Amino acid sequence: MYFHIMQKIQIYDSPLGKLTFVSDGLALTGIWFDKQEPLQQILKAPHEVCNLPIFDETRLWFDTYFDGQQPGFIPRLSLIGTAFRQQVWRNLQLIPYGETTSYGTLAKQIGQQLGKNKMSAQAIGGAVGNNPISIIVPCHRVVGTNGTMTGYAGGIWRKEFLLDLEVKHRR
Protein backbone atom coordinates (compact mmCIF):
# COMPACT_ATOMS: atom_id res chain seq x y z
CA MET A 1 0.00 0.00 0.00
CA TYR A 2 2.83 2.46 0.79
CA PHE A 3 5.73 0.78 -0.94
CA HIS A 4 5.64 1.96 -4.55
CA ILE A 5 8.63 4.25 -3.85
CA MET A 6 11.29 4.29 -1.18
CA GLN A 7 9.75 5.75 1.93
CA LYS A 8 11.50 8.54 3.79
CA ILE A 9 11.16 8.49 7.57
CA GLN A 10 12.05 10.56 10.59
CA ILE A 11 11.54 9.88 14.30
CA TYR A 12 9.94 12.50 16.56
CA ASP A 13 10.11 12.22 20.36
CA SER A 14 6.70 13.27 21.67
CA PRO A 15 5.13 13.26 25.14
CA LEU A 16 3.34 10.10 23.94
CA GLY A 17 6.49 8.28 22.88
CA LYS A 18 8.19 8.08 19.53
CA LEU A 19 6.23 9.02 16.44
CA THR A 20 7.54 8.04 13.02
CA PHE A 21 6.86 10.49 10.22
CA VAL A 22 6.68 8.87 6.77
CA SER A 23 6.87 10.74 3.47
CA ASP A 24 7.05 10.13 -0.25
CA GLY A 25 9.54 13.03 -0.34
CA LEU A 26 6.94 15.75 -0.87
CA ALA A 27 4.06 15.13 1.53
CA LEU A 28 3.32 13.14 4.65
CA THR A 29 1.97 9.67 3.94
CA GLY A 30 1.95 8.44 7.52
CA ILE A 31 2.48 9.24 11.19
CA TRP A 32 2.72 6.15 13.34
CA PHE A 33 3.26 5.30 16.98
CA ASP A 34 5.88 2.65 17.73
CA LYS A 35 4.71 -0.92 17.28
CA GLN A 36 1.74 -0.06 15.04
CA GLU A 37 1.49 -2.73 12.34
CA PRO A 38 1.66 -0.37 9.32
CA LEU A 39 4.91 1.08 10.70
CA GLN A 40 6.35 -2.42 11.09
CA GLN A 41 5.58 -3.08 7.41
CA ILE A 42 7.19 0.21 6.35
CA LEU A 43 10.33 -0.58 8.34
CA LYS A 44 10.61 -3.99 6.62
CA ALA A 45 10.59 -2.33 3.19
CA PRO A 46 13.40 -0.19 1.79
CA HIS A 47 13.33 3.18 3.53
CA GLU A 48 15.63 6.08 4.28
CA VAL A 49 15.97 8.04 7.52
CA CYS A 50 16.46 11.62 6.39
CA ASN A 51 15.67 15.28 6.85
CA LEU A 52 13.11 16.86 4.52
CA PRO A 53 11.25 20.19 4.51
CA ILE A 54 7.97 18.29 5.09
CA PHE A 55 9.47 16.79 8.25
CA ASP A 56 10.55 20.27 9.43
CA GLU A 57 6.95 21.48 8.97
CA THR A 58 5.60 18.42 10.74
CA ARG A 59 7.97 18.85 13.70
CA LEU A 60 6.87 22.50 13.98
CA TRP A 61 3.21 21.40 13.88
CA PHE A 62 3.77 18.88 16.68
CA ASP A 63 5.92 21.24 18.77
CA THR A 64 3.10 23.80 18.59
CA TYR A 65 0.40 21.21 19.29
CA PHE A 66 2.12 19.64 22.30
CA ASP A 67 2.84 23.15 23.62
CA GLY A 68 -0.94 23.48 23.99
CA GLN A 69 -1.56 25.66 20.96
CA GLN A 70 -3.67 24.94 17.94
CA PRO A 71 -1.32 24.92 14.93
CA GLY A 72 -2.44 27.44 12.33
CA PHE A 73 -1.47 25.21 9.42
CA ILE A 74 -1.49 21.60 8.28
CA PRO A 75 1.58 20.08 6.65
CA ARG A 76 1.04 18.78 3.14
CA LEU A 77 -0.67 15.40 3.33
CA SER A 78 -0.96 12.54 0.86
CA LEU A 79 -3.77 10.38 2.21
CA ILE A 80 -3.58 7.02 0.47
CA GLY A 81 -6.81 5.04 0.61
CA THR A 82 -10.14 4.33 -1.03
CA ALA A 83 -12.45 7.21 -1.94
CA PHE A 84 -14.66 6.29 1.03
CA ARG A 85 -11.76 6.32 3.49
CA GLN A 86 -10.50 9.61 2.11
CA GLN A 87 -13.94 11.13 2.60
CA VAL A 88 -14.01 9.93 6.21
CA TRP A 89 -10.52 11.32 6.81
CA ARG A 90 -11.52 14.70 5.33
CA ASN A 91 -14.49 14.76 7.69
CA LEU A 92 -12.21 14.01 10.64
CA GLN A 93 -10.29 17.18 9.81
CA LEU A 94 -13.50 19.18 10.27
CA ILE A 95 -13.93 18.15 13.92
CA PRO A 96 -12.93 21.26 15.89
CA TYR A 97 -9.90 21.24 18.18
CA GLY A 98 -10.94 20.26 21.70
CA GLU A 99 -14.27 18.77 20.62
CA THR A 100 -15.44 15.23 19.92
CA THR A 101 -18.03 13.54 17.77
CA SER A 102 -19.41 10.01 17.78
CA TYR A 103 -19.03 7.31 15.15
CA GLY A 104 -22.82 7.45 14.71
CA THR A 105 -22.85 11.22 14.13
CA LEU A 106 -20.00 10.90 11.66
CA ALA A 107 -21.91 8.09 9.90
CA LYS A 108 -24.99 10.33 9.55
CA GLN A 109 -22.91 13.22 8.17
CA ILE A 110 -21.13 11.06 5.62
CA GLY A 111 -24.35 9.25 4.71
CA GLN A 112 -25.92 12.64 3.92
CA GLN A 113 -22.88 13.64 1.86
CA LEU A 114 -23.18 10.41 -0.12
CA GLY A 115 -26.95 10.75 -0.51
CA LYS A 116 -27.65 7.63 1.54
CA ASN A 117 -30.36 7.23 4.16
CA LYS A 118 -28.14 5.09 6.37
CA MET A 119 -24.44 4.64 6.84
CA SER A 120 -22.94 2.03 9.12
CA ALA A 121 -21.06 3.37 12.13
CA GLN A 122 -18.92 0.23 11.81
CA ALA A 123 -17.91 1.21 8.27
CA ILE A 124 -16.95 4.63 9.58
CA GLY A 125 -15.04 2.98 12.43
CA GLY A 126 -13.10 0.89 9.94
CA ALA A 127 -12.05 3.96 7.98
CA VAL A 128 -11.22 5.91 11.16
CA GLY A 129 -9.15 2.96 12.40
CA ASN A 130 -7.14 2.95 9.17
CA ASN A 131 -6.23 6.64 9.34
CA PRO A 132 -2.55 6.80 8.34
CA ILE A 133 -1.87 10.30 9.72
CA SER A 134 -2.22 10.09 13.51
CA ILE A 135 -3.14 13.27 15.41
CA ILE A 136 -2.98 15.70 12.45
CA VAL A 137 -5.98 13.87 10.98
CA PRO A 138 -7.69 13.80 14.38
CA CYS A 139 -9.25 10.36 14.66
CA HIS A 140 -8.71 10.69 18.43
CA ARG A 141 -11.70 13.08 18.45
CA VAL A 142 -14.15 10.28 17.60
CA VAL A 143 -15.75 8.61 20.61
CA GLY A 144 -18.51 6.11 21.31
CA THR A 145 -22.14 7.25 21.18
CA ASN A 146 -22.29 7.83 24.93
CA GLY A 147 -18.89 9.55 25.00
CA THR A 148 -16.93 6.41 25.87
CA MET A 149 -13.31 6.18 24.84
CA THR A 150 -13.30 3.49 22.20
CA GLY A 151 -10.70 2.28 19.75
CA TYR A 152 -7.53 4.21 19.15
CA ALA A 153 -4.63 2.55 17.36
CA GLY A 154 -2.14 4.31 19.62
CA GLY A 155 -3.94 3.13 22.75
CA ILE A 156 -6.81 4.60 24.76
CA TRP A 157 -4.40 6.32 27.18
CA ARG A 158 -2.96 8.33 24.26
CA LYS A 159 -6.45 9.25 23.05
CA GLU A 160 -7.32 10.49 26.55
CA PHE A 161 -4.06 12.46 26.74
CA LEU A 162 -4.74 14.17 23.39
CA LEU A 163 -8.34 15.05 24.25
CA ASP A 164 -7.33 16.34 27.70
CA LEU A 165 -4.59 18.48 26.13
CA GLU A 166 -7.03 19.99 23.64
CA VAL A 167 -9.80 20.63 26.16
CA LYS A 168 -7.32 22.25 28.55
CA HIS A 169 -6.06 24.64 25.85
CA ARG A 170 -9.24 25.15 23.81
CA ARG A 171 -9.96 28.82 23.10
Please give the residue ranges for each predicted region.
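DNA-contacting interfaces and partner/effector-binding or oligomerization modules
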Residues: 2-29, 37
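Compact structured core domains
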Residues: 25-74
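A sequence-level detector of short linear motifs
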Residues: 20-21, 30, 102, 151
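Compositionally biased, low-complexity segments enriched in small residues
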Residues: 1-2, 155
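Nucleic acid-binding interface residues in structured DNA/RNA-binding domains
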Residues: 8-15, 60, 69-171
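Histidine (H) residue identity feature
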Residues: 4, 47-50, 140, 169
